[in-house]
Amino acid sequence: NKNGTAIMLIGVLTFTAQAVGITFDLASVITIILVGLFLETGSGGIPGGGLIIALIFVKAFNLPLEIAAIVGGIYRLLDMGITTINVMGDMVGTIIVSYSEKNISQRL
Protein backbone atom coordinates (compact mmCIF):
# COMPACT_ATOMS: atom_id res chain seq x y z
CA ASN A 1 0.00 0.00 0.00
CA LYS A 2 2.90 2.34 0.56
CA ASN A 3 5.22 1.54 -2.32
CA GLY A 4 5.81 5.23 -3.03
CA THR A 5 6.75 5.91 0.58
CA ALA A 6 9.34 3.14 0.51
CA ILE A 7 10.88 4.56 -2.66
CA MET A 8 10.89 8.08 -1.20
CA LEU A 9 12.59 6.92 2.02
CA ILE A 10 15.47 5.37 0.10
CA GLY A 11 15.69 8.44 -2.15
CA VAL A 12 15.91 10.88 0.76
CA LEU A 13 18.50 8.75 2.55
CA THR A 14 20.60 8.41 -0.62
CA PHE A 15 20.36 12.15 -1.32
CA THR A 16 21.47 12.99 2.22
CA ALA A 17 24.32 10.46 2.24
CA GLN A 18 25.65 11.66 -1.11
CA ALA A 19 25.47 15.29 0.02
CA VAL A 20 27.81 14.57 2.93
CA GLY A 21 29.98 12.05 1.05
CA ILE A 22 29.01 8.87 2.89
CA THR A 23 28.97 5.49 1.16
CA PHE A 24 27.23 2.36 2.39
CA ASP A 25 28.62 -1.17 2.51
CA LEU A 26 26.52 -4.30 1.99
CA ALA A 27 25.66 -4.67 5.68
CA SER A 28 24.47 -1.06 5.80
CA VAL A 29 22.33 -1.55 2.70
CA ILE A 30 20.64 -4.58 4.27
CA THR A 31 20.04 -2.58 7.46
CA ILE A 32 18.64 0.32 5.42
CA ILE A 33 16.21 -2.01 3.65
CA LEU A 34 15.00 -3.59 6.90
CA VAL A 35 14.61 -0.30 8.79
CA GLY A 36 12.90 1.25 5.76
CA LEU A 37 10.51 -1.69 5.60
CA PHE A 38 9.54 -1.31 9.25
CA LEU A 39 9.13 2.48 9.05
CA GLU A 40 7.15 2.30 5.82
CA THR A 41 4.84 -0.37 7.20
CA GLY A 42 4.20 1.53 10.42
CA SER A 43 3.64 4.92 8.82
CA GLY A 44 0.15 6.33 8.85
CA GLY A 45 -1.73 7.47 5.79
CA ILE A 46 -1.81 11.12 6.79
CA PRO A 47 -0.90 13.98 4.44
CA GLY A 48 2.72 14.97 4.95
CA GLY A 49 3.41 12.00 7.20
CA GLY A 50 5.96 10.60 4.79
CA LEU A 51 8.24 13.58 5.40
CA ILE A 52 8.29 12.95 9.15
CA ILE A 53 9.03 9.26 8.54
CA ALA A 54 11.84 10.26 6.15
CA LEU A 55 13.42 12.51 8.78
CA ILE A 56 13.23 9.70 11.36
CA PHE A 57 14.80 7.36 8.79
CA VAL A 58 17.67 9.76 8.11
CA LYS A 59 18.28 10.33 11.83
CA ALA A 60 18.37 6.55 12.43
CA PHE A 61 21.55 6.43 10.35
CA ASN A 62 23.13 9.50 12.04
CA LEU A 63 22.94 11.69 8.96
CA PRO A 64 22.32 15.44 9.26
CA LEU A 65 18.65 16.40 9.31
CA GLU A 66 19.41 19.79 7.77
CA ILE A 67 20.16 18.27 4.39
CA ALA A 68 17.16 15.96 4.48
CA ALA A 69 14.99 18.95 5.42
CA ILE A 70 15.68 20.38 1.96
CA VAL A 71 13.28 17.73 0.69
CA GLY A 72 10.59 19.37 2.87
CA GLY A 73 10.56 22.33 0.50
CA ILE A 74 9.47 20.20 -2.43
CA TYR A 75 7.62 17.49 -0.54
CA ARG A 76 4.18 18.60 -1.82
CA LEU A 77 5.35 17.94 -5.37
CA LEU A 78 6.92 14.62 -4.40
CA ASP A 79 3.78 13.62 -2.52
CA MET A 80 1.73 13.74 -5.72
CA GLY A 81 4.01 11.16 -7.32
CA ILE A 82 4.18 9.09 -4.13
CA THR A 83 0.39 8.97 -3.95
CA THR A 84 0.17 7.96 -7.61
CA ILE A 85 2.60 5.07 -7.06
CA ASN A 86 0.67 3.96 -3.96
CA VAL A 87 -2.67 3.99 -5.79
CA MET A 88 -1.26 2.16 -8.82
CA GLY A 89 0.19 -0.53 -6.55
CA ASP A 90 -3.18 -0.97 -4.85
CA MET A 91 -4.95 -1.21 -8.22
CA VAL A 92 -2.55 -3.85 -9.53
CA GLY A 93 -2.96 -5.87 -6.34
CA THR A 94 -6.74 -5.64 -6.56
CA ILE A 95 -6.77 -6.77 -10.20
CA ILE A 96 -4.49 -9.73 -9.43
CA VAL A 97 -6.72 -10.86 -6.56
CA SER A 98 -9.84 -10.41 -8.71
CA TYR A 99 -8.36 -12.53 -11.50
CA SER A 100 -7.27 -15.23 -9.06
CA GLU A 101 -10.77 -15.40 -7.57
CA LYS A 102 -12.37 -15.17 -11.03
CA ASN A 103 -14.44 -12.12 -10.04
CA ILE A 104 -13.40 -9.98 -12.99
CA SER A 105 -14.22 -10.03 -16.66
CA GLN A 106 -11.45 -11.15 -19.01
CA ARG A 107 -12.18 -8.10 -21.19
CA LEU A 108 -10.29 -5.85 -18.77
Task: Provide a role label for each language-model segment.
Residues F57-K59, E66-A68, G73, V92, ...:
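Canonical bilayer-spanning transmembrane alpha-helix
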Residues T16-V20, F38, A54-L65:
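Interfacial segments of multi-pass membrane proteins
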Residues T41-G44, P64-I67, G81-N86:
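Juxtamembrane membrane-interface segments at transmembrane alpha-helix termini
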Residues I74-Q106:
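Membrane-helix cytosolic exit motif
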Residues G4-I10, G44-A54, M88-M91:
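Transmembrane helix boundary and interhelical junction motifs in multipass membrane proteins
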Residues N1-E40, T94, I104-L108:
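Helix-loop-helix junctions within the multi-pass membrane cores of secondary transporters/permeases
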Residues N3, L13-T16, L34, F61, ...:
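Hydrophobic transmembrane alpha-helices
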